[in-house]
Amino acid sequence: MFKKLLGDPNARKLKKFQPWVTDINILEEDIQKLSDEELKAKTGEFRQALEKAKTKDEEKAILEEILPEAFAVVREAGKRVLSMRHFDVQLLGGIILHQGQIAEMKTGEGKTLVATLPAYLNGLTGKGVHVITVNDYLARRDAEWMGQVHRFLGLSVGLIQQGMNPEERKKNYTCDITYATNSEVGFDYLRDNMATNMEEVVQRPFNFCIIDEVDSVLVDEARTPLIISGQVERPSEKYIKAAEIAAALSKEKEHYEVDEKARNVLLSDEGFAEAEQLLAVQDLYNPEDPWAHFVFNALKAKELFIKDVNYIVRDDEVVIVDEFTGRVMPGRRWSDGLHQAIEAKERVDIQPETQTLATITYQNFFLLYPKLSGMTGTAKTEEAEFEKIYNLQVTIIPTNKPTGRKDLSDVVYKTEVGKWKSIAQECAEMHKEGRPVLVGTTSVEKSELLSRLLGEGKIPHQLLNAKPENVERESEIVAQAGRGGAVTIATNMAGRGTDIILGGNAEYMAKLKLREYLMPKVVKPEDDDGLGMVRVSGLKKSHVAKGFDPQQKVKTWKVSPQIFPVKLSQETEGMLKLAVNLAVKEWGERALPELVVEDKVAIAAEKAPTTEPVIEKLREVYNLIRQEYENYIEREHNQVVGCGGLHVIGTERHESRRIDNQLRGRAGRQGDPGSTRFFLSLEDNLLRIFGGDRVAGMMQAFGVEEDMPIESGLLTRSLEGAQKKVETYYYDMRKQVFEYDEVMNNQRRAIYAERRRVLEGRDLKEQVIKYAEQTMDDIVEAYINPELPSEEWELDKLVEKVKQFVYLLADLTPEQLFDLSMEDIRTFMHEQVRNAYDIKEAQVNQIRGGLMRDAERFFILQQIDTLWREHLQQMDALRESVGLRGYGQKDPLIEYKSEGYELFLDMMTDIRRNVVYSLFQFQPQPAVQTTAAETV
């Protein structure tokens, strides 16, 4: 009703930006006439205009002024380099991103291309633009693919990848546009704030950030803090013993209860007594021999962390599975002893526990950017959160072609068994009709269950989950999920970023064929154990093939033959072999690292100009292969469209409607037909945990067979209600994390600013003298009570304390302070400590000029780092303890804020005092003197 009266706010926003789109379209004709050189020269013109800006506001005004022409230039460059022209809706998306908003664009609408517009415009300032993606593969793909446009126009493009060294990182961050993943940029920020000199700092001050899949980063991962940690030795026997205790305690005997909603386990009085008896201790909380932490973690590991759902065991290691993407996350560990508890439960080696050295949540990290924007297919459901926490508006961009997707109503089964049988049946029917099916499952375990059912029915299918053997083929599987009759099972839709094209993706198939022939010939064998590696077995030492070591792992790039639609013609295959031989001749036999070859294949598969003859030859062959595949695929594409397109099956409602919408969004891309349906059961987690007793009552009421679908308005409403409940619950949790971390964030900003000032060596002496004066003030206040007459002041203790800090004031006596007021004593002490510091500086600098400055930097950084680490632990402990104060009618957050502030002030005082003490005690070794003398 209100919408009709006031008009749709989204439509109003789009209407406001429409004149710019019109301007860009008017400019298109003129820009088309420019030669390549003239087009590139536009970058220089824009930069000259921006150089005139003296303030941020002036810069903003100039950017808006040049926006239509800059966007028209990017559109033309896209046509010339990538043969891709930005549609009008993509221009709108680009404008919205430049405004610092979130653009909601449906799957397949070319979000990646949209980002080139604001990235180029803001890259002109020279202050850096970060384009953030969710994994290394996508960052590399976008930097290579879209980076062509920027490089063609004369902007530098950087890429940050896991495993890069600091020099490479620094070089890539100084580029105009840098592609990276959220975790790499976040960890680099934390590492920069642990650097001991400016050479180690890799990032520049932040400017503008575009996040692809913004909902995944700012909502799904918002509760996950980035943590850099150091190892702490804890006895592994305690974890093993606690795992035995957890196994002995039982939920049925009411030793503990599991709160699945809060993901917590609560011990009952009986449970406490039983655990204490089994451990033969008086008190689980005894500070001398604490057990509570170990037992609680062991119970959580037993009840809440399930193998093949939350983690997998690989090579005797517990590896986390990302609950949102279904991908494994090697190298990531749960903190606070939880990972060790799971290792004890699984009886694998227990790795040492870690202590947090630096931490930040994604929420607070991305708020460090002065301008932030993002793109996703699904943001509207979380609009309130984006606005409240990040101050980001969401604008929905219309699709280029009307969508042809049908969302069919949910079917609900009484039991899970009934549900899975029906899903397998539906897959079989679709396969028979020749329609491709994509089934989204929520865990590795469920995907394997369906795979078994389909196997029994002899239905050919592809399985994509976090298991290592499937990860390597992820994009390959997703790219072929649109073939006629293909059945693909994917866990939580890993593989966002690869399009499902009806009939199959000819470009991707051609690239795979190129890799299959090229990689084994030019990639050097690695000794490390990567994924998808196979042991070379059956080789006897006596006749080992040249270049092979029987123990060495050799990677295979062989693709399952059914992936390719047709066999290559002899002529094309012959040309492919010739091109590979040329590559071997130029690059050497098995001489290049894998990533380098991947990059070369990616460039060969694109249209950007290249001067490298091998790449030109590979590109020529790639285009021939693609053409052969395309001719065949076109027929298949038309057949699949005729059958109704891709059918997407959801096997469980996710906790968030947004994730369901993402799965639905895989069907009906760019106007293609398609359909989606969710199969649910009354035993599904969402209904079980959040649907409450009403659903349990319904289960009794429905006296139906397990494989009979139930359709009921009440049930659908119950489901939607449950989802909204969960969303609100998780939003409240994220908001709480944000509010608590906001307290830490203010402290973090203060300490990092102080640290950076010291690192840059600004006014170090003044800083230390200020510390010394404040320390003197603290001593004066401790021993002088202005309320008492001066005869009762403890001047002798005061002087003694000063001498402990500053031994150079050995001549100071209480008598010198007798007739002075408190204020005068303060001033006198300031003078004394300044003089003492000058003497100390002269002594130290005799050994080596400038040594005192180095000492100041070293001691301040050392104290900041050590005490900040301890402070992080204290804040964690405080956060756990304030939770209990809610029972005492106190607001835990207010308590956390005030006590956290007190702890922070104490830490700052300790830093000051320790630095002053350390510097006055600092006695440079005479040995330094002799070496210094020799080198003169």
Swiss-Prot record:
It is an enzyme of class 7 (translocase). Belongs to the SecA family. GO terms for biological process: intracellular protein transmembrane transport; protein import; protein targeting; protein transport by the Sec complex. SMART domains: SecA_DEAD (SM00957), SecA_PP_bind (SM00958). It is a peripheral membrane protein. PANTHER family: CHLOROPLAST PROTEIN-TRANSPORTING ATPASE, SECA INNER MEMBRANE COMPONENT OF SEC PROTEIN SECRETION SYSTEM. CDD domains: DEXDc_SecA, SF2_C_secA. It is found in: Cell inner membrane; Cellular thylakoid membrane; Cytoplasm. It comes from Trichodesmium erythraeum (strain IMS101). Gene3D superfamilies: Helical scaffold and wing domains of SecA (1.10.3060.10), P-loop containing nucleotide triphosphate hydrolases (3.40.50.300), SecA, preprotein cross-linking domain (3.90.1440.10). This is Protein translocase subunit SecA. GO terms for cellular component: cell envelope Sec protein transport complex; cytosol; plasma membrane-derived thylakoid membrane. It catalyses: ATP + H2O + cellular proteinSide 1 = ADP + phosphate + cellular proteinSide 2. Part of the Sec protein translocase complex. Interacts with the SecYEG preprotein conducting channel. Has a central role in coupling the hydrolysis of ATP to the transfer of proteins into and across the cell membrane, serving as an ATP-driven molecular motor driving the stepwise translocation of polypeptide chains across the membrane. Probably participates in protein translocation into and across both the cytoplasmic and thylakoid membranes in cyanobacterial cells. ATP binds at residues 90, 108-112, 499. Its EC number is 7.4.2.8. InterPro entries: Helicase_ATP-bd, P-loop_NTPase, SecA, SecA_CS, SecA_DEAD, SecA_motor_DEAD, SecA_preprotein_X-link_dom, SecA_SF2_C. Keywords: ATP-binding, Cell inner membrane, Cell membrane, Cytoplasm, Membrane, Nucleotide-binding, Protein transport, Thylakoid, Translocase, Translocation, Transport. One of its GO terms (molecular function) is protein-exporting ATPase activity. Monomer and homodimer. Part of the essential Sec protein translocation apparatus which comprises SecA, SecYEG and auxiliary proteins SecDF. Other proteins may also be involved.
